Amino acid sequence: MFGFGPSYDSYKLKVQLKLAVSRIQILKNKKANIVRDEKRNVAELLRKKNEESARIRVETIIRDEYLIECFQIIEVLCELLHARINLINATTEMPLEMKESIFTLVYSSQRIQIPELEQIKNQLKAKYGKGLENEANCHCSTHVNPKIVHKLSYATPDPSIIFQTLSEIAEKFNVDWCGSDYPPPPQLIMPQPIIVQQQPQILQPPPQIIHHQQQPQILQPPPQIIQQQQQPQMPSFPIMSPPQQPTFSQIQHQQQIQQQYQQQQQSPQFPSAPPSFYNNNSGNQTPQFPTISTNNSDGYSNDKFNNGNNNYNNNNNNNNNNNNNNNHNNNNNNNNNIPPPYQPSSDTGYPDYDELTARFEALKRSNDF
């Protein structure tokens, strides 16, 4: 890094912090001895009634005591900065928890003549920029320790503090001194009471408080919740579509069915008589029976057996002729009892069920069911 000022060196900063602590301890002890000697000299001046000289020297004692207190604060801040040197090295910007410590050291280095504090200020300026010193002076009331700002100021001490310090020195060294000419400290000055002439107060009757009678609160019933009764749902009817007109092929098929139905009505089929046991067209075949072996020893001959068979066949033929005649007569009677063919009474050509029922009853009576 090329620049006009010194570069930041953490090791050098750490060494300067340790040296600053040692130097501050030496200066603190040295200033404490000087203050003790100065107080003895001021006590001798008070014993000789040389109060003006004592008052001037007391101001020096007060500044030295302030400086000792500042040394104690700076010593603690240097130890804190030495302990958190790694935090300073790890961050590029100034940590918030270290801001007051850094600004206080930079601010005090301008007012206390310590070489180590000057080196610490240069290292911090190399780390955080050259404007650090100017920023510390501008924001001394916010970022700098307020005790350091107050005790390192160039203003003269307050007269009350001077009077208090002289009183402490005279008491410590057993000097008979009465500081009547010096003003007391501000906490000892008693304010004079202010006498105010009070005018006689006219007694007025107290205002009448009118109590309004509270009307009894009438409890109102809660609002009724009107539940809407669910109306019964009407059954939904199927959507009736208009009847489809029959096609030409359907009309022809319907006419054919009507014609077949009329033909069946004109020639009704009736139950026929059960067929005869023997068919006449078969040539009067006689049933075959198993032949029985006969011997002359039984007293029966084959001629007698054949004669018996012929007589049986003749009787069967006569019975068959009689049955055929009866069937022919029954057929003639049935033809006479057949009702006339059905003629549809409706214009549409469809059968009337009442007429069909009547015809069916007549047919049952004719067949004796």
Swiss-Prot record:
GO biological process: protein localization; protein transport
Coiled coil: 12-59
UniProt superkingdom: Eukaryota
Pfam families (UniProt xref): Ist1
Region of interest: Disordered: 224-354
Alphabetical UniProt keywords: Coiled coil
Compositional bias annotation for Polar residues: 277-305
Skewed-composition ranges (Low complexity): 225-239, 246-270, 306-337
PANTHER family reported in the protein's UniProt record: IST1 FAMILY MEMBER, IST1 HOMOLOG
Similarity-based family: Belongs to the IST1 family.
Protein name: IST1-like protein
Organism encoding this protein: Dictyostelium discoideum
